[in-house]
Amino acid sequence: MKRVILTGLATVGILALSAFTSVTGKVTSKKSHLTFFSHTDVEDISADNYKAVSTLDASTGAVVFSVPMQSFEFDKSLMQKHFNSPKFLDTKQFPKAKFKGNIIDLTKVHFDKDGTYQTTVEGDMTLHGETKNIKEKISVIVKGDEVNVKSKFNLTLADYKIAFENGKPATNIAKTVEVSIDVFY
């Protein structure tokens, strides 16, 4: 009986401590889901990527993403082939998209307190060999020792020298695509 009580108290103690754990320092993503969506009158195109890796420094707000471009998954294999081809993203020459930036107002995010925090991230996005400064809204959801970052924003393909002058892709792919990010640290 004494052993059961001690085991119960130890379990309650461990659970209580874990409930008050906060995120500090640099953390690496545990899982990620990125999507892009293109809408035109001709068709909708979407793809998923579960292979992105990210780090977040809770003390400085620094954020880094690395996205392997060949890991985007499409419903149709032909779309995947076109996506990776030299005529579109040329993923052999440009295998990764990268983002390196910072949470602008880190005082809005309390990594030591459960909650959902709205803020902005700003930094350099490199895609298809082109680097542009972007500034986007993000949601930071803190729950115990886990942080979830979500964002949805638009990327204009021409900003990264991705363009179709003629042919079927010119009418099938939107000039601006919607990107969604859902990352757990």
Protein language model regions, located:
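Bacterial Sec-dependent N-terminal signal peptides
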Residues: 1-26
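Low-complexity, acidic/polar, glycine-enriched regions of mature
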Residues: 20-185
